[in-house]
Amino acid sequence: MINKFVINYILLSYMGLCFLYGCTRAEKCNIKGHFPGSIPFYIDLYNINTGEKVFSDSLNTNDFNLPIKILPKGIYQAVFSWKRDLLRPQDIERFSRQPELGVPKYFLSTTFWLDNEEANEYNLSFDKVYNQDELEEILFNQVADEPTHMWVKSNGLNNKLYCQYLDLLDGFKHKNRHQKDSLQQVENYYIEHKMYDEAKIVSATLREPWLDLVKNELITQEILFMKKHISSDVIIQIYNFQVNSKQDFERYIKVYNSFPSNIKQVLDRRLRHFME
């Protein structure tokens, strides 16, 4: 009888400890990694849906492990910044006119899906090992449509899916940049041979963020990706980011039609004026 009582007591104690441990784990998650920027550097975390800054810190070591309070699941942007030693003429001019904006900095950001019910640990990851000089050279010469070099990864299925989507985007950004480089050579040829009307047409094309053929191909692949994973919470947020006009709604109509009726009812509150 005593042995049975002792066993039950041990089991209940164990269950209690497990419960308490589970509650402790649920209070926060962690973002960790190695960032090769100049010390000190800064990290800011934003909720993409609301634009709210939900976390901010300055770090004096390249290796970090930061506890983050429990946040609503969704897509977040992690922004890393640090002081710039190398400035362009336009940077100096901007600072002289608007010193209140502060000294120019390097910025590197990425987005990721955060859900502590899926994962409590999020790891900063780069496409290769960079030192500070290499990273700053990339950022100094970077154009807006170049692929990202940084991700925040976890074991959560939704974040893995979101990283797949980022890889899809990066592939088309690279393709867009490559084809623009080829068009730039065509423009240079026209100018060299005084074919200014032709050069003007090419120049107008190059000013657009995306080449039409590449953009259309990207949208096709986005639609296939979203339809394939239509039941994921990630897809609803991606769809919301992409559809901001009647034209967007028509472009992604196949995705909308694939959502179950309960999701459509939620989306319709925002999209109803695009459906008219």
Report residues per predicted region.
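A non-transmembrane, solvent-exposed segment enriched in polar/low-complexity residues
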Residues: 23-205
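Bacterial Sec-dependent N-terminal signal peptides
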Residues: 1-35
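Short linear sequence motifs
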Residues: 7, 12-14, 69, 158, ...
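Charged, long alpha-helical assembly modules
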Residues: 195, 201-276
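Sparse, context-dependent recognition of short Cys/His-centered cofactor- or disulfide-binding micro-motifs
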Residues: 8, 30, 97-99, 210, ...
